[in-house]
Amino acid sequence: MAAIFRASLVAFATLASCTDASKLLGFENKRHIIPNSYIVALKEGLPERDFETHMAWVSDVHSANVALAGGASTSGVKHTFKINGWKGYSGSFDENTLHELITNENVDYIEPDRMSHIASLDRKFALETQRNAPSWGLGRVSHRQGNSRDYVYDSTAGEGVTVYSIDTGIDIKHPDFEGRASWGINTVDDIDEDGHGHGTHTSSTIVGKTYGVAKKAKIIAAKVYDARGRGPDSATLKAIEWAVDHAQKNNHTGKAAMNLSLVTDSPRAVNAVCTKAVEAGIFLAVAAGNDNRAVTNESPASADKVCTVGATRLGDQKAGFSNYGRLVALYAPGQSITAAFPNGRTGTISGTSMAAPHVCGVGATIMALEGVTPQKLCDRLKQLAHPSVRNPGPNTTNKLLYNGSGQ
């Protein structure tokens, strides 16, 4: 594997010296690159007929180069993407094919496909009150002051809103979901279950009966990470494409949310499709990341129009691990959060992965209650939030998520 990886870097250096290197993005960052695997973005507005012609050309070029090499060392196109006007594809290509892709007039840019990972550290209201809620985050987001464990929320509780969980899958049989969780797509393996636990935990925080914020919303699993909490960025792109298509076909746009408690190293493509998803009518809550640094190129935290969430701990301090900076929209509880785990269990874990679901859940509640559009929802949440976060970090908001309960 090391030899293959070094060879791919040599190929990149050779290509960059003799082609339009401006189309090659992110190759200088060697972290988590999958050898000979690429994400290819096509130029904005490419007509469907030209897209189909291009894909046939790619197939022909790959087949010809495999024949010249005396056999298949790469597999060609794996996924195609059409996401609210953004078109592209991913696959495994040799150096000769990559050279032809770079020089093709329809190609906008090419990024290496990478293994990305979850963003956790461990394994006039009709109000209702959940007394002594089992997760401190629920009490915190429903009170201006931080001294209550009761969760106070509007009785609509996200009813009529569909949430897409881009994660490790969901244990849909867990009693916390009351039958409101279902499977949508699996783009990483052939095991339709949550072998890690992260996706069940985040989904429980969003919609769970006991541990959740929006207790009447529905949630759909789009599995992009395996039992190790890892998967290629192309799997994430394919899942987002599926979610946008599903929302559009089922009239969920305008009343849909998506949670991305993950961090990738392919910012251009992932950011582009996340922005397209918001424009299509889906609210996106995303984790800021856990490196205790300013959000810059982390994706999807740096994408336009998403709602990027930092994490706090008890006492309204920024969690020591949480990223910060001007791209953070607001903070939410993210340290030592208790929620459902697979096989009927519960788990307590930390990360901005745990903060984003609180925002996704409150977002679903506000969408159902006020009819705020997904494109304007993050601004509404910032308007409701209160300035409680201590030491939020340089050039960072001190706004803490609040559901507007009046408490």
From Swiss-Prot:
Pro-peptide positions on chain: 22-119
Region of interest (Disordered), residue spans: 388-407
GO cellular component, one term: extracellular region
Domain Inhibitor I9: start-end pairs: 37-118
Keyword Signal belongs to the record: yes
One GO biological process term: proteolysis
Organism: Coccidioides posadasii (strain C735) (Valley fever fungus)
UniProt-listed Pfam families: Inhibitor_I9, Peptidase_S8
Top-level lineage group: Eukaryota
Record key words, sorted: Glycoprotein, Hydrolase, Protease, Secreted, Serine protease, Signal, Virulence, Zymogen
Record EC number: 3.4.21.-
Positions of the catalytic residues: 167, 198, 353
Residues of the signal peptide: 1-21
Positions glycosylated per UniProt: 251, 259, 395, 403
Localization per record: Secreted
Protein name: Subtilisin-like protease CPC735_024010
GO molecular function: serine-type endopeptidase activity
Domain Peptidase S8: 135-407
UniProt similarity note: Belongs to the peptidase S8 family.
Role according to the record: Secreted subtilisin-like serine protease with keratinolytic activity that contributes to pathogenicity.
